[in-house]
Amino acid sequence: ETILPVDMMPRSTNEVPSLAMVMVIDHSGSMSSAGDPVSGATNLDLAITAADRAVEELTENDYVGVVTFDDRYDWQLPITKVEDKDEIHKAIESVAEGGGTTIKPALSAALNEIVKCDADIKHVILLTDGQGEDRNYGSIIQSYVDSGVTLSTVAVGADSDQSLLQTIARGCSGRYYYCDNGTDMPKIFA
C-alpha cells in the first residue's frame, strides 16, 4: 500500500542524470590578446579549445547551447539535444573577435533559456578574461542561486580578472578554472 508519494525502488546504478550546459563565450576585442606566448594562441583561441573539450564530455542524453558576447550577446547555438557533435564544434569554432565587453546580459540570457530545459542538471560555463564592465554581479549571482542553476568560470589569459571570476563561480556553486596556455587547458568535465 502506498503511503508516501515516493518511489522506494532503487534506480539503476547505470543511470546517468541528463545535463543541460550553456557555454557563454567572450569574443570581445580583449580576447584577441595573446593568451599562450608559446603557441601564439589568442585568449579567444583558448576559450574555443576549452569549449570544444567540454563538448567531448557530453552524451546524447545531454543538451548544449552557446552564447557569445562582446558589447551585445548572440545565441551562436540555441540549446539543443547533443546529437551531432561536429555541428556543435562548427558553431563554437565559428566565433570571431568582436567589440566591447558586456557580460551580464549574456549570463541572463543563458539562465533564462536553460531553466526551460528538461534536464536533471543545469550548468552554465563562462569563458572570458573578465575585462570590461563593472564588478557588481550580486543580482546575477542571486538569480542563479534562486534558479538552482550552477555557473562555472574559466579565466582565460594572464590578464584575466581572476578575482572576479572566482567570486562569480563561488557565488553560483560552480567551479573556477584558469587557463593561459593550450597545454594546461582545463578539462571542465572529467
Predicted regions and their residues:
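Exposed acidic/Ser/Thr-rich ligand/metal-binding surfaces
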Residues: T2-A190
